[in-house]
């Protein structure tokens, strides 16, 4: 599959797979100078990239596991969704869960991008469901530990 990608700044880096069978493409910060993530705040980090995602697909943006666990940096709306009709710059929201400022440098791998198929549906309004289940309406802990 080919997905058109545009570099909005010359120093932007294309997403890359780190291993042959990786599912997520690493996304890099695109910065002119270091960016400070203050504790307990969300900061939008630019990637310098925009995409022409095919209509039947969307992107999911997820944290990189090592980056998150080692640095206490999260993506607050994980997974983030990038719709096929969005043409602006891919920005990654990062939340510093730690107690000290964290420095983001140009080229740092800050997130993973996954390409997902989008499924469209026609909702069918009903007054009752025809299929009952053992679980029924039980939620939040109803299936035990």
From Swiss-Prot:
Enzyme class: hydrolase
Pathway: Pyrimidine metabolism; dUMP biosynthesis; dUMP from dCTP (dUTP route): step 2/2
Catalytic activity: dUTP + H2O = dUMP + diphosphate + H(+)
SUPFAM superfamilies in alphabetical order: dUTPase-like
Gene3D superfamilies: 2.70.40.10
One GO-annotated biological process of the protein: dUTP catabolic process
Annotated substrate binding sites: 64-66, 77, 81-83, 91
Function (record text): This enzyme is involved in nucleotide metabolism: it produces dUMP, the immediate precursor of thymidine nucleotides and it decreases the intracellular concentration of dUTP so that uracil cannot be incorporated into DNA.
PANTHER family: DEOXYURIDINE 5'-TRIPHOSPHATE NUCLEOTIDOHYDROLASE (PTHR11241:SF0)
Family, per entry: Belongs to the dUTPase family.
The protein's name: Deoxyuridine 5'-triphosphate nucleotidohydrolase
Lineage: Bacteria, Pseudomonadati, Spirochaetota, Spirochaetia, Leptospirales
């Amino acid at each position: 599959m080919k997905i058109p990608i545009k570099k909005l700044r010359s120093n932007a880096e294309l997403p890359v797979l780190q291993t042959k069978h990786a599912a997520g493409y690493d996304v890099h910060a695109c910065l002119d100078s270091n960016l400070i993530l203050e504790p307990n705040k969300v900061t939008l980090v630019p990637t310098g990239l925009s995409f022409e995602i095919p209509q039947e697909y969307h992107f999911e943006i997820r944290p990189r596991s090592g980056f998150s666990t080692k640095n206490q940096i999260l993506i607050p709306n994980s997974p983030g969704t990038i719709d096929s009709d969005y043409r602006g710059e891919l920005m990654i929201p990062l939340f510093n869960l730690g107690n000290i400022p964290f420095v983001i440098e140009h080229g740092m791998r800050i997130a993973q991008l996954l390409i997902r198929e989008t499924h469209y549906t026609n909702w069918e309004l009903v007054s009752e469901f025809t299929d009952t289940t053992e679980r029924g309406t039980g939620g939040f802990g109803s299936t035990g530990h």
